[in-house]
Amino acid sequence: MVKAFGLSKPNLLHTQPHNNMKSKILLALSLLFMPLISSAQQAVDLGQVALSKWRIGTGNYSGIASLGNNRYAVVSDKEITDGFFTFLIDQNATTGAIESVYLESFKGNSSPKVSAATGISVRDCEGIAYFPPAGTVFIAGEGDQKILEYNMNGQPTGRELTVPKIFGLGNIVPNYGFESLAYCPTTHRFWTTTESTLLKDGNAAGPMHPGEQNLLRLQSFRDDLLPIAQYAYRMDRGKADDFGKIYVYGVSEIATLPDGRLLVMEREADISNGYLSSQCTCKIFMVNPQESWMIDSSTDLQKLDPNKFMTKRLIATFTTHMTPFKQNFANYEGMCLGRQLNDGRQTLLLISDSQGGYGKGPVHLKDYIRVLILPDF
């Protein structure tokens, strides 16, 4: 029957080399195009725009959270009172570009605790998250290592997240405590971590310990404000030499994706003695708690199996500079989801902290807002 149609059983001795050659060609092509495939999975960076474009004065912006309908709550770490600003941020529905930014108002605690030495809030507000179930916001303070709830008029409600003792003020490297806060409405989880390694977990990356890798604990909380899960997170290795007069390296923010995955921003800023060779590099990684190994406060991170740290996927990296020819230095501390575009793509907003326009002479920092368009994970 086969021969009747002019066909016969293939000779495997003759076809095998052909199949091998075909496999080799496919392998070569896959290796050739792998970098292109990888880059296609990176976020699209639309760059940064100075808030001064919309006549917004310099600030100390350290966290941002979406309130819905193009409104955002923004915290500052150097205000007289703890609380938050409200911004209107409009993005182009097709491109994601920022079209306008308007600073509405500041909502502050009417009875703040103020430092006698500095005249500003002792809370050192660093991270903020909107909590839809109660219509409130939670603010993480690095000065007290607490995460307190505020109503939309900026007044404390008296409630707070039950932070595990391991994150207490006495257990952090000074000024390297809670820097981040996020909430996922889908999974009903709050998320935070310290900026750098806890004292019990090892050395913090920096001039005293060059080339160190920070080992962090990502902590989540339920809607009832109780802690629910903890995960081990290993940062990329920090700078090993040639430090400037100020060096800061740690996780400056966390954002949540609708499906519960997290975006973690690793920020490395190096300020030179003369300022004009300073730079700040930010890397944004995606991690998935649902595919990660849970730990608890008793876990020894230095002895933990490397495979039990969260698996990171880099989605964006960028560096800003302060040089005689390029003065776009930006210390990004806030990050949250922006608007969803008409084609379904999701944007990410980042806001920088200029330290109130810090600088001297003609050189001063600016506050920037930056837009990334996330890849289709």
Regions found by a protein language model. Give the residues of each.
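Sequence/structural signature of beta-propeller domains
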Residues: 41-377
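Bacterial Sec-dependent N-terminal signal peptides
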Residues: 1-42
